[in-house]
């Protein structure tokens, strides 16, 4: 049986209740369809699906919905017993699905899943590490400049590659003008950071990224080695100057790699960040405010279902 958990407020679903109805019709007698907007609701659904013994967990929504679903389901299932996960997309940001090569409309993907499960057909599985951030599970973590970039991206309702280019241009102009936007984008954070138990030498940083997928959102692909080793995530940390950071952001968007002597680039299984002052962090595109201590570790490996067309 298939267990579908849907976020009715996902970006491409809100205001379109007919989409939810279509998904329910496609699922039909092949499983259970549940809606959740909070982590507590997700936990209740996880408990139900575990008791029912579902064979496939289908998640309808974007990166934020996936992050909340895994944060609820992984503890309930004990981390290692989670069934294969089918990403139905449907959110404003679908970075993880895109990284895994999952494309198409939510309805089309669910039809393929139902067809494959119904005839007990074989399907391709893509195994991907999760990243545990304190008590949450996701795939992308950011602190400093990555958070500033997201905040600028979320300022209005427009989305897409043109919006990303517009944000980068705003960054470049701020570097020239040295105004308030400059300080907002490049305000450093002070912290003691440990990677694999080793304390990094600095205390002032402009950016920290941890990821288990090669794209970290908005078209940026700085973590190309993120999936190189099971049980590890790629860790990028730097105290680059604002000018160097802005130029590197442009390089990454153009498909080039990060450069600079002041860049720490490692594969790690754990990291601890002790912040001098509360700072905002992001997990899979969602911003969490006023963090003081952040513990990162490689989480369980998820088997993602990639049904064939």
Question: Which stretches of residues belong to each language-model region?
Answer:
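Glycine-rich phosphate/pyrophosphate-binding beta-alpha loops
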Residues: 142, 146, 209-224, 287
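Catalytic core of DAGKc-family lipid kinases
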Residues: 36, 78-206
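Cofactor-binding loop segments of dinucleotide-utilizing enzymes, especially the Rossmann-like FAD-
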Residues: 6-9, 90, 238-240, 307
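Short glycine-/acidic-enriched loop or helix-start segments at secondary-structure transitions
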Residues: 14, 68-70, 96-98, 150, ...
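ATP/nucleoside-binding phosphotransfer catalytic cores, i.e., glycine-rich phosphate-binding loops
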Residues: 195-202, 221-309
């Amino acid at each position: 049986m298939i267990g579908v958990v849907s976020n009715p407020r996902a970006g491409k679903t809100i205001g379109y209740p007919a989409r939810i109805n279509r998904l329910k019709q496609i699922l039909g007698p092949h499983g259970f369809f549940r809606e959740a907007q909070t982590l507590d609701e997700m936990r209740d659904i996880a408990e139900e699906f575990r008791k029912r013994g579902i064979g496939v967990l289908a998640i309808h929504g974007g990166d934020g919905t996936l992050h909340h679903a895994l944060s609820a389901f992984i503890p309930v299932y004990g981390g290692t017993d989670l069934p294969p996960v089918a990403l139905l997309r449907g959110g404003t940001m679908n970075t993880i699905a895109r990284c895994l090569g999952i494309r198409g409309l939510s309805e089309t993907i669910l039809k393929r899943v139902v067809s494959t499960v119904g005839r007990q057909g074989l399907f391709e599985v893509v195994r991907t590490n999760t990243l545990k951030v304190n008590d949450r599970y996701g795939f992308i973590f950011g602190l400093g400049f990555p958070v500033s970039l997201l905040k600028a991206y979320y300022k209005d309702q427009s989305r897409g590659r043109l919006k990303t280019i517009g944000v980068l241009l705003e960054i470049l102009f701020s570097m020239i003008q040295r105004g308030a936007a400059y300080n907002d984008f490049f305000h450093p954070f002070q912290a003691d950071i440990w990677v694999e138990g080793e304390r990094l030498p600095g205390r002032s940083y402009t950016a920290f990224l941890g990821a288990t997928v090669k794209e970290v959102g908005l078209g940026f692909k700085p973590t190309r080695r993120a999936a190189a080793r099971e049980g590890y995530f790629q860790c990028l940390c730097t105290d680059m100057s604002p000018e160097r950071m802005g130029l590197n952001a442009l390089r990454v968007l153009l498909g080039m790699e990060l450069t600079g002597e002041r860049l720490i680039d490692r594969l790690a299984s754990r990291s601890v960040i002790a912040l001098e002052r509360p700072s905002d962090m992001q997990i899979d595109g969602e911003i969490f405010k006023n963090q003081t201590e952040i513990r990162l570790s490689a989480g369980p490996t998820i088997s993602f279902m990639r049904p064939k067309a």
